[in-house]
């Protein structure tokens, strides 16, 4: 199963299903299928989700793609991404990973936990 570490601040929205996408830059590729999120600093805290789609596009289009352009204007989006990727630029290509919530993932007929 694919595994992805997440900073503690972002873990609760994944667990509750509020966060159903993540944006990555210059990291190992994620593919559709099962993904285990692991909370950085607390490896026992995990959430399993089903990745439904992975899309490459410029960072400048990412907020609109995940329907969060109101919450993430350019300055906020860049500042947030630069917390994790200090060298990222507005036109760099990112991978957007979209997934079901953990609760929706549990309902899949092939889920084995």
Where do the language-model regions lie?
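Structured alpha/beta reader/binder surfaces that contact nucleic acids or chromatin modification marks
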Residues: 1-113
């Amino acid at each position: 199963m694919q595994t992805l570490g997440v900073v503690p601040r972002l873990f609760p929205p994944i667990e509750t299903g509020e966060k159903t996408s993540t944006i990555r830059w210059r990291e190992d590729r994620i593919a559709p299928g099962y993904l285990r999120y692991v909370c950085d600093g607390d490896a026992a805290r995990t959430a399993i989700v089903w990745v439904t789609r992975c899309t490459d596009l410029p960072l400048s289009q990412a907020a609109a793609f995940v329907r969060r352009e109101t919450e993430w204007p350019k300055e906020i989006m860049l500042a947030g991404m630069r917390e994790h990727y200090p060298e990222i630029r507005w036109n760099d290509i990112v991978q957007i990973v979209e997934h079901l919530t953990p609760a929706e993932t549990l309902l899949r007929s092939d889920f084995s936990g």
